[in-house]
Amino acid sequence: MSYAYLFKYIIIGDTGVGKSCLLLQFTDKRFQPVHDLTIGVEFGARMITIDGKQIKLQIWDTAGQESFRSITRSYYRGAAGALLVYDITRRDTFNHLTTWLEDARQHSNSNMVIMLIGNKSDLEARREVKKEEGEAFAREHGLIFMETSAKTAANVEEAFINTAKEIYQKIQDGVFDINNEANGIKIGPQHSPASQSLNVGGSGGNQGGNCC
């Protein structure tokens, strides 16, 4: 299917926070509870609609292990958006956010949109990180913030699409150089001058790989 723009995303965060599960829920609308760890980088894609235009999201799901960190860094450079994920039931994954964020900002373009995601919101009884803490971290570092559940699909659509809306708005504002694909944006065959309103919807797609 043709598209007006292609946006490249990267999903980052510690092992086991649900990065692959979020991607699978967004692209395939299903939850896979039993899964293997992501080895290196896996890939997914889906078409959405913003302002009446087809936008293709090309999403790279990265391994959280330190041994794969150098591979992950190479994918920052071509990304327009990043989903930085922690697990609300594991305090250590929240404590590691600063390291992930520093890594992302060091190796990406300065205009990359970063969405902070507190995943596993369905496990409220096991929560170790308050929602207010996630909100405060996002405010301090200039990030967008949402809590999600890859299991129930709560806010999963919104997380991916709101990130795309921010990227789209930056294009409208002239922040992104859309002729430089190093910014993680590619002009598609459907491209025409864009208007200012943002009406968002989505349609399904497919992705291979397992959940971590």
Swiss-Prot record:
SMART domains, per database record: RAB, RAN, RAS, RHO
Alphabetical list of InterPro entries matching this protein: P-loop_NTPase, Rab_GTPases_membrane_traffic, Small_GTP-bd, Small_GTPase
Q: What is the predominant subcellular site recorded for this chain?
A: endoplasmic reticulum
GO terms for biological process, alphabetical: protein transport; vesicle-mediated transport
Membrane topology note:
Lipid-anchor
Q: Where is this motif: Effector region?
A: 35-43
The residues the record assigns to binding GTP are: 13-21, 61-65, 119-122, 149-151
Q: Give the keywords, sorted.
A: Endoplasmic reticulum, ER-Golgi transport, Golgi apparatus, GTP-binding, Lipoprotein, Membrane, Nucleotide-binding, Prenylation, Protein transport, Transport
Reading the lineage from the top rank, the first entry is: Eukaryota
Tell me which CDD domains the record gives.
Rab2
Q: Where is it located?
A: Endoplasmic reticulum-Golgi intermediate compartment membrane; Endoplasmic reticulum membrane; Golgi apparatus membrane
Looking at the UniProt record for this protein, which Gene Ontology cellular component terms does it annotate, in alphabetical order?
Answer: endoplasmic reticulum membrane; endoplasmic reticulum-Golgi intermediate compartment membrane; Golgi membrane
Which PANTHER family does this UniProt record tie to the protein? Answer: DRAB11-RELATED (PTHR47979)
Query: What family classification does the UniProt entry report for this protein?
Result: Belongs to the small GTPase superfamily. Rab family.
Reported function: Required for protein transport from the endoplasmic reticulum to the Golgi complex.
What name goes with this protein? Answer: Ras-related protein Rab-2
GN (gene name): RAB2
